[in-house]
């Protein structure tokens, strides 16, 4: 038995098939804070939840819209810095990946972090969330230095990352995917359901309540994945790694609207992408990095005027 538990710790908790709409959840450890892992490993195999038989009814939607999720009002003060990165450097495998990087993210702001493959965007995200630590420099959240904080403590303080290739449990519905995370933090089932209804209703996604992740469009999948990252804690800074990747134009437009709604909730957002023109219309500020160095910084309306800079730092395929 001990050998089997160790195997699950290294990989993931195996799913136990249920009957009807009841399932025992498969949960990856990456979704959890360190303090909740023991709870998960000892109890999750006995937990079951039923997906609602019908879509949200009118009464539920009214309750949801009267209890719209709102983050702390101070998060909407766009003149105050929430995240400050000062002269960060990082070497990986003997190669300098980031060189003296500095940036500021204000409350309620959307910041674009652009650059070609290998520019250092993902490394910077990993430094912010605490997957790796800087060799030099300083990271502050709300003016508190967090350089030495591990990933789970940074998550508790309100930093969340949605990686490009990480997402939902494909055989589970939107409701089940959100429930699987919320049940680790909320004991009252009715409160969990209320929270899910609020989230889905606020973003107009209630029609996905019974849709399995494998049957969602690319845009729908990314929206529910994002909600999974913000549903169980007071997120202050949301990092989105190429949220437009592999999406059709209609889905890109929908995701951009969704990100603006996240900003309107009070979240501060950093987006990575290769394509300046795909996201420039939703950005408050933009930073272009190349070979681990900040090359261009400023409002999109100023950067878009510099065709030579865009072609040089992002590639000759870009045109104005």
How would you name each of these model-derived features?
Residues 212-216:
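Conserved ABC ATPase signature
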Residues 129:
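Helix-to-loop junction immediately C-terminal to a conserved catalytic motif
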Residues 165, 172-183:
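Q-loop/switch helix immediately C-terminal to the Walker
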Residues 190-208:
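Conserved ABC ATPase "signature" region
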Residues 137-145, 157:
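Conserved ABC transporter NBD signature motif
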Residues 238-242:
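Catalytic Walker B motif of ABC-type/P-loop ATPase nucleotide-binding domains
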Residues 114-116:
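The feature captures the beta-strand-to-loop junction immediately N-terminal to the Walker
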